[in-house]
């Protein structure tokens, strides 16, 4: 059995997310599986490292699949890019150890979130950022972000779909940056609960708008109540930026 690792970029705007929900429906996983299965002449299942939601984008998603026959990597890449829609791109294909698992072997993930922070809309970025038309207090957002770095129970920053045995995750870095009309948030950690990144961004937006005190974050973490963060940041601004193994 041969195991192949795919590195993938996609514009998630028109898709229902990464995870296949039915028989090769409009998902990233479904589209890629359909083309690979056609290529090898049998049904193939791929495993992604991150099950991104509808509307979320990826600069470096990683997946793997297994094949009975040995495949030529550059030919696989060429075939996939020829037949996949042009909002999905395979940037690399390589054969890896048979025990490599894209989801379970990942050690760290980095997400980038883009906020368009001008009074006027940006029509070119409406599918690729969240528009906040009131000026954000980035200094306060940075102060709040410091409280979220480290190992914590992130129940308050998840949604009801998160049914993990442990809600503890470690955030390695959480940076807030201003750049040419944008406020960008980059977060790295050992793993993230469902909607955790979007809830973190939502909390930072609330802080930036003066709706939440930065010093309230430790209490929110401690109390573990999901209803304390009212803002779930839009999917459109979220990018899976990098995965480390």
Swiss-Prot record:
Its EC number is 5.4.99.12. GO terms for molecular function: pseudouridine synthase activity; RNA binding; tRNA pseudouridine(38-40) synthase activity. Pfam families: PseudoU_synth_1. It catalyses: uridine(38/39/40) in tRNA = pseudouridine(38/39/40) in tRNA. It is an enzyme of class 5 (isomerase). NCBIfam families: hisT_truA. Homodimer. This is tRNA pseudouridine synthase A 2. The lineage of its organism: Bacteria, Bacillati, Bacillota, Bacilli, Bacillales. The gene is truA2.
């Amino acid at each position: 059995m041969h195991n192949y690792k795919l590195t993938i970029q996609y514009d998630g705007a028109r898709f229902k997310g990464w995870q296949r929900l039915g028989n090769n429906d409009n998902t990233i996983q479904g589209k890629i599986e359909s083309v690979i299965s056609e290529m090898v002449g049998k049904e193939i299942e791929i495993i992604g490292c991150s099950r991104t939601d509808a509307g979320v984008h990826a600069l470096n998603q990683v997946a793997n699949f297994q094949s009975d026959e040995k495949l030529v990597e550059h030919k696989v890449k060429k075939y996939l890019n020829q037949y996949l829609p042009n909002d999905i791109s395979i940037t690399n294909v390589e054969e890896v150890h048979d025990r490599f698992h894209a989801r379970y072997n990942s050690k760290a993930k980095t997400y980038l979130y883009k906020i368009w922070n001008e009074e006027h809309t940006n029509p070119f970025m409406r599918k690729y950022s969240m528009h906040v038309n009131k000026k954000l207090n980035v200094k306060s957002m940075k102060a709040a972000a410091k409280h979220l770095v480290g190992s914590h129970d992130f129940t308050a920053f998840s949604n009801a779909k998160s049914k993990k045995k442990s809600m503890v995750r470690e955030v390695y870095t959480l940076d807030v940056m201003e750049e040419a009309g944008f406020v960008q948030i980059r977060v790295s950690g050992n793993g993230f609960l469902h909607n955790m990144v979007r809830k973190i961004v939502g909390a930072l937006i609330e802080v930036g708008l003066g709706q939440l005190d930065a010093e309230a974050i430790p209490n929110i973490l401690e109390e573990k109540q999901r209803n304390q963060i009212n803002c779930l940041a839009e999917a459109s601004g979220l990018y899976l930026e990098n995965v480390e193994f």
